[in-house]
């Protein structure tokens, strides 16, 4: 088995059973194409989401190092920060979150509702900054201050996206391959590509398990030129950890994130409304709505490699719907 080295890494069991992989009949009829969805928005902690897969590995490493505090960073409405805070609460750890306001809004819902509200419920220590211009350095500086206060901090990068965290999505590729075996031959897989760990982990796993399936990352914050090296660097780092080769081409579409990260656009919001009305499934305006807009447009523009079944990776994010009201 090509991914046997995964078992060498300590991992906490937060998720348990595989998340559902479902056919979307009404959405498929609407688009004239077989569409399946991997429902990582229903992972069983803090309103779900993809970051829990990464945190299974990262939190295990934190405990191995004897940490009593998890430190991470993100936007005020970060799904990753929300899930990190929930994991810290579950494990009896302190959590410190370095937050920015990337869209510069003064809207009360954005500043206090959605993920930000949940951070308070998880008793998170909030540190605000003007901007996460160099998040790795800023997190290390914060960790130094926290350590000086007598804590034992463990730094988790933005999005949980380092080689260790991204192993969670190599593991997810295993899950997907097992669920598809004998049931459906997926032609294309679509995922939101942001901090790059989910995309890179899937790239490594699917290359070895479902090599005939193309993986397309729809960017949510950067151009292809800026995003490609982030994904490739992580892809290679993951492969090195697992003692594998990783030669699959990284495919990115950057036509759907304008006007910028965290700012809803019409195509993304239409995708959110469409899936809600047709399937009762909630996307979000920052990540999955824009990724689904890419899938929808990709079908109409014939951007996929063929007309076979498409799998959409639902990474979560529904709490942001409340933060972005009345835009949704």
Swiss-Prot record:
GO terms for biological process: D-amino acid metabolic process. Belongs to the ACC deaminase/D-cysteine desulfhydrase family. It catalyses: D-cysteine + H2O = hydrogen sulfide + pyruvate + NH4(+) + H(+). This is D-cysteine desulfhydrase. Its EC number is 4.4.1.15. CDD domains: ACCD. GO terms for molecular function: D-cysteine desulfhydrase activity. The modification N6-(pyridoxal phosphate)lysine is found at residue 51. Its cofactor is pyridoxal 5'-phosphate. InterPro entries: ACCD_DCysDesulf (IPR027278), D-Cys_desShydrase (IPR005966), D_Cys_desulphydr_bac (IPR023702), TrpB-like_PALP (IPR001926), TrpB-like_PALP_sf (IPR036052). Gene3D superfamilies: 3.40.50.1100. HAMAP family: D_Cys_desulfhydr. It comes from the Bacteria. Homodimer. Keywords: Lyase, Pyridoxal phosphate. Catalyzes the alpha,beta-elimination reaction of D-cysteine and of several D-cysteine derivatives. It could be a defense mechanism against D-cysteine. NCBIfam families: ACC_deam_rel, PRK03910.1-1, PRK03910.1-3, PRK03910.1-5. Pfam families: PALP.
